[in-house]
């Protein structure tokens, strides 16, 4: 604007990236590391529906609103879940091939594609990139989807809830922090001894807890209200999933007790000719809105047609604030007290914000009651979520 306010979504996002870069460098300097740049990376999983163009043209509500306003329950929906990761239909496969070709021409690193849970629902996921570039590429992807669908007699629906009775669409925001190409959220083989990782982990947990209202507000929309908390997407209550191993590390730090590491479980398939498989330790119940999945956090509340600038701007800025608090706390600390002071800060931070950690079932009836006892917000709708924008 003429008076200097940012009216777009790009500028606040870039400012948040600069803030996180600045504060993360300060934290790394505390650990004796000089890096050129720290960036946040994003890998957005884009869900969408494809229907026949003639069916789309016959529905004014789809044309005008992007979703159906009335209709009957389908004879067959998603009861058997056989559509999920099933064989892709030839017409859809041709659409996906052309979409890949067009996206690659634009340097969009489109990678995986598959059928989703609901009939006619699909997903495309790219290789992760720096946040700003990844979000630009996601917007290009959404635009190309609509254009290319018409080449195959199809219409692409990007609304969060185009049809009742079946799942809606979201866009998982896979977020991490990278310093000169090294992932700072990699816990290593011994996360309990990795002080640098514990500082970043504690900072992120504290950021999400202190700014859960803004996190919820950043994904608020009329379309997203149809799916959040409807047993097809995370609840509207913000919580952090860490997995059993990291949760045990956090518990040991908070309670000053030794951490008992758990050897990775092997799955016995009962077939001697097949190699043993290591059991996955990441979150598979999909009910957590903000889950640690190996070496990144997955923010699952974002809507399918949403510009991801808002949630990433909030997340980057909130984490930068906590990293600044740690770097300031460590100023002037002598080397002899370094480990003690770092562990003290991590313990105090995790203790103050442990209420946001929840590894259970977010769909359960007991969770909203438990969340209320913990003092967590439950802003179920957009009108509930937006008033925090007026807070100072």
Predicted regions and their residues:
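Glycine-rich, acidic/polar active-site loops that bind/position phosphate-bearing ligands
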Residues: 1-158, 166-171, 176-392
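Glycine-rich N-terminal segment of FAD-binding domains in flavoprotein oxidoreductases
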Residues: 162
């Amino acid at each position: 604007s003429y008076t200097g306010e940012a009216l777009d979504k790009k500028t606040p996002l870039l400012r948040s990236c600069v803030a996180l870069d600045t504060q993360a460098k300060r934290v790394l300097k505390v650990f004796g590391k000089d890096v050129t740049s720290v960036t946040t990376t994003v890998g957005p999983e884009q869900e969408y529906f494809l229907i026949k163009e003639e069916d789309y043209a016959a529905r004014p509500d789809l044309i005008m609103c992007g979703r159906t306003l009335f209709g009957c329950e389908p004879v067959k929906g998603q009861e058997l879940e056989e559509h999920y990761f099933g064989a892709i239909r030839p017409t859809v496969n041709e659409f996906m091939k052309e979409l890949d070709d067009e996206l690659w021409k634009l340097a969009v690193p489109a990678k995986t594609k598959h059928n989703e849970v609901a009939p006619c629902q699909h997903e495309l996921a790219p290789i992760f990139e720096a946040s700003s570039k990844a979000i630009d590429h996601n917007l290009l992807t959404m635009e190309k989807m609509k254009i290319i669908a018409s080449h195959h007699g199809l219409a692409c629906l990007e609304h969060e809830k185009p049809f009742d009775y079946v799942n809606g669409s979201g866009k998982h925001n896979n977020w991490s922090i990278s310093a000169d190409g090294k992932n700072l959220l990699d816990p290593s083989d011994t996360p309990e001894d990795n002080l640098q990782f514990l500082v970043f982990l504690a900072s992120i947990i504290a950021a999400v807890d202190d700014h859960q209202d803004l996190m919820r507000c950043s994904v608020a929309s009329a379309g997203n209200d149809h799916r959040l908390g409807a047993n097809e997407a995370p609840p509207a209550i913000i919580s952090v999933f860490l997995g059993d191993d990291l949760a045990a590390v956090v518990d040991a730090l908070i309670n000053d007790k030794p951490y008992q590491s758990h050897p990775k479980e092997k799955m016995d398939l009962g077939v001697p000719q097949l190699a043993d498989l290591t059991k996955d330790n990441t979150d598979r119940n999909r009910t957590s809105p903000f889950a640690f999945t190996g070496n990144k956090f997955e923010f699952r509340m974002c809507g399918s047609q949403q510009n991801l600038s808002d949630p990433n701007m909030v997340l980057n800025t909130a984490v930068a604030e906590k990293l600044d608090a740690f770097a300031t706390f460590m100023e002037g600390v002598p080397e002899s007290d370094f480990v003690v002071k770092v562990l003290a800060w991590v313990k105090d931070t995790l203790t103050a914000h442990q209420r946001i950690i929840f590894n259970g079932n977010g769909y359960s009836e007991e969770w909203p009651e438990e969340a209320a006892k913990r003092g967590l917000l439950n802003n179920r709708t957009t009108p509930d979520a937006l008033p925090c924008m007026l807070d100072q």
